[in-house]
């Protein structure tokens, strides 16, 4: 009887442990995957500042290229592709939050004109769905459906991102007109260097906070360093904390100056932004243009026929 109770207790404890482990995994995985878009969403009402700068550049300090490709013109109520390319060297490894090396992730923000929005799933063709893959897109705000964000996702698989976009119809949306509109895009590869609260991540360079001599360097058990700097001016000591990730550049007994780099810069990623233009084309204008071209072609044909008829008349009169 006692053995049966013991077995039951062990079974209950194992079940609880497994349940708690699964919950922790789900919670941490969700928070990590959603962290980067949330930084911008929580801190800024609009991701594009009045100066034209996209706010992601406040945390991703290195400047890198990004490219966007959209059709020159689209008709109303039409689904089209906005292709964002975030190029980088696939062999590069970035410093992760725990100080280890891993692959780069990518993310993007697409700022569309008012009225343009993410295409509903039932409007996306099978060919376009295949290009999109397993990517998930979301609106920057519930009331800003024209601003889309995506990521972070593995860069090796998604350095090219296809956004399925639905164009508006001015017939049903009176604030939309048949005009040329700008589209803005921002794309990053790798982790940022600064968090929204202003603190540094471990994916950046750390500088000395005082001038003096490095009196002690302690390597911490979980990685990183504590660097003690003895100020030569008044003798007081300053301790700089270096998280796991950056490589140390100084040694004990070395003289250093304030703001001198204590570590290398491990960042291999960066952020870039670009823009494109798209025309919301009026179908009646297209039909009118086609009618005009057809009229010109028909007029030229009639002129040629009339000329040949006139030449025949002249030839017959000369023979007569």
UniProtKB/Swiss-Prot annotation:
InterPro entries recorded for this chain?
Cyt-f_TM, Cyt_f, Cyt_f_lg_dom, Cyt_f_lg_dom_sf, Rudment_hybrid_motif
Task: Look up and give the membrane topology term.
Answer: Single-pass membrane protein
What the entry lists under Pfam families is as follows: Apocytochr_F_C, Apocytochr_F_N
Cellular component terms, GO, for this chain's entry?
Answer: chloroplast thylakoid membrane
Query: Where would one find the signal peptide in this protein?
Result: 1-35
Q: Which PROSITE patterns match?
A: CYTF
Cofactor(s) recorded for this entry are: heme
Give the GO biological process terms: photosynthesis
Keyword entries, A-Z:
Chloroplast, Electron transport, Heme, Iron, Membrane, Metal-binding, Photosynthesis, Plastid, Signal, Thylakoid, Transmembrane, Transmembrane helix, Transport
* Ranges that cross the membrane: 286-306
GO molecular-function terms, A-Z? electron transfer activity; heme binding; iron ion binding
Which amino acids does the record list as binding heme? 36, 56, 59-60
* Cofactor remark from the record: Binds 1 heme group covalently.
Subcellular location per UniProt equals: Plastid, Chloroplast thylakoid membrane
Per the record, the domain of life is: Eukaryota
Subunit organization: The 4 large subunits of the cytochrome b6-f complex are cytochrome b6, subunit IV (17 kDa polypeptide, petD), cytochrome f and the Rieske protein, while the 4 small subunits are PetG, PetL, PetM and PetN. The complex functions as a dimer.
The UniProt entry's sequence similarity note says: Belongs to the cytochrome f family.
Biological function: Component of the cytochrome b6-f complex, which mediates electron transfer between photosystem II (PSII) and photosystem I (PSI), cyclic electron flow around PSI, and state transitions.
Q: What is this protein called?
A: Cytochrome f
């Amino acid at each position: 009887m006692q053995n049966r109770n013991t077995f039951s207790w062990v079974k209950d404890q194992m079940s609880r442990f497994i349940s708690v482990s699964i919950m922790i995994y789900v919670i941490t995985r969700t928070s990590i995957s959603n962290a980067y878009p949330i930084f911008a969403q929580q801190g800024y009402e609009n991701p594009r500042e009045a100066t034209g700068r996209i706010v992601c550049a406040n945390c991703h300090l290195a400047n890198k290229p990004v490219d966007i490709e959209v059709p020159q013109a689209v008709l109303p109520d039409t689904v089209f592709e906005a292709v964002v390319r975030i190029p980088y060297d696939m062999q590069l490894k970035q410093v992760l939050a725990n100080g280890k090396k891993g692959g780069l992730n990518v993310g993007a923000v697409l700022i569309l004109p008012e009225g343009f929005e993410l295409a509903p799933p039932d409007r996306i063709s099978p060919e376009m769905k295949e290009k999109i893959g397993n990517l998930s897109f979301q609106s920057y705000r519930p009331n800003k459906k024209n601003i889309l964000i995506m990521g972070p996702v593995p860069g090796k698989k998604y350095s090219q991102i296809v956004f399925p976009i639905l164009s508006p119809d001015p017939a049903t949306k009176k604030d939309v007109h048949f005009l040329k509109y700008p589209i803005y895009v921002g794309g990053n590869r790798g982790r940022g260097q600064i968090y929204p609260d202003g603190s540094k991540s471990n994916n950046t360079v750390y500088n000395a906070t005082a001038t003096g001599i490095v009196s002690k360097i302690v390597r911490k058990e979980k990685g990183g360093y504590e660097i003690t700097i003895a100020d030569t001016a008044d003798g007081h000591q300053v301790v700089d904390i270096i998280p796991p990730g950056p490589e140390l550049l100084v040694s004990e007994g070395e003289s250093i100056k304030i703001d001198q780099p204590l570590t290398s810069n491990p960042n291999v990623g960066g952020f870039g932004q670009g823009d494109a233009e798209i025309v919301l084309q009026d179908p009646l204008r297209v039909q009118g243009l086609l009618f005009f071209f057809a009229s010109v072609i028909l007029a030229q044909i009639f002129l040629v026929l009339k000329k040949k008829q006139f030449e025949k008349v002249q030839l017959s009169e000369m023979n007569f």
